[in-house]
């Protein structure tokens, strides 16, 4: 049970991806002569945690509670792929975990990259049904999910050389800069000559009107979510009213969650 009474909290549930990234980075910092590097213990623990959460759960469930599965993309897979590819911190005479993973290099490399591919394919099945290639759910922080998914596509493409999903990757980037139903950039001040957010959830702009160029706003949400938000109210006319739909809405106005 949460220890606060606020209606919106950051209730992260997953942890295996964090531990995977931690173990992978500890291994990367070790010299190949280090005893623990030689046994491959930290590397092996990273792989074992990768197996606990092969696909980030919001991708599978097509939804999430507020920050339920943060940080929306598994960076540990990318670190492991780099280390296997470079055989980073592995001794010449490997033993234990490192020997197993080096000897089975193609198998483990393909397995880890396939974790990314499986997640991308799930989103693609949804995205392929609309002109914007939109397969990311319209939940809170949908723009953060969009960035995370584009990052996953990029890491998969650059590590494997498979550009099958490059158009999907680019569509998610384009979405953030105006190729969306509202025709507006989701990044404050970028491009300078375009339609960009002017009233983000930020004390800097709300109180002192300071610019926060480069700030990413939360983005559109399902209409059903918007109608049930607590403490949210539009103080100005909805400039995007013509483009709102029963599916999703976007407002250039203060919303909980704010600029990322």
Name each model feature, range by range:
Residues 2-6, 53-60, 124-136:
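Acidic/His metal-coordination segments adjacent to aromatic residues that form catalytic metal sites
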Residues 6, 14-41, 45-48, 71-126, ...:
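Aromatic (Trp/Tyr) and acidic
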Residues 11, 61, 65, 69, ...:
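Structural signature of alpha-solenoid helical repeat scaffolds
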């Amino acid at each position: 049970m949460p220890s606060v009474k606020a209606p919106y909290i950051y209730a992260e549930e997953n942890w295996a991806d964090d531990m995977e990234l931690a173990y992978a980075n500890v291994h990367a910092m070790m010299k190949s002569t280090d005893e623990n590097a030689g046994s491959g213990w930290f590397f092996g623990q990273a792989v074992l945690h990768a197996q606990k959460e092969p696909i980030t759960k919001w991708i599978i469930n097509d939804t999430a509670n507020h920050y339920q599965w943060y940080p929306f993309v598994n960076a540990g897979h990318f670190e492991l792929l780099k280390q296997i590819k470079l055989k980073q911190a592995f001794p010449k005479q490997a033993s234990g975990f490192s020997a197993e993973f080096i000897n089975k290099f193609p198998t483990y490399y393909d397995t880890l990259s396939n974790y990314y591919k499986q997640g991308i394919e799930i989103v693609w099945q949804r995205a392929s049904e609309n002109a914007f290639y939109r397969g990311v759910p319209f939940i809170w922080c949908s723009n953060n999910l969009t960035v995370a998914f584009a990052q996953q596509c990029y890491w998969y493409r650059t590590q494997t050389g498979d550009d099958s999903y490059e158009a999907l990757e680019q569509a998610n980037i384009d979405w953030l800069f105006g190729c969306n139903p509202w025709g507006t950039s989701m990044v404050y001040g970028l491009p300078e000559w375009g339609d960009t957010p002017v009233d983000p959830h930020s004390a800097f702009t709300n109180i002192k009107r300071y610019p926060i160029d480069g700030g990413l706003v939360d983005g559109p949400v399902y209409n059903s979510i918007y109608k049930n938000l607590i403490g949210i109210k539009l103080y100005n006319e909805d400039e995007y009213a013509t483009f709102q739909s029963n599916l999703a809405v976007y407002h250039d106005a203060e919303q909980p969650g704010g600029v990322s």
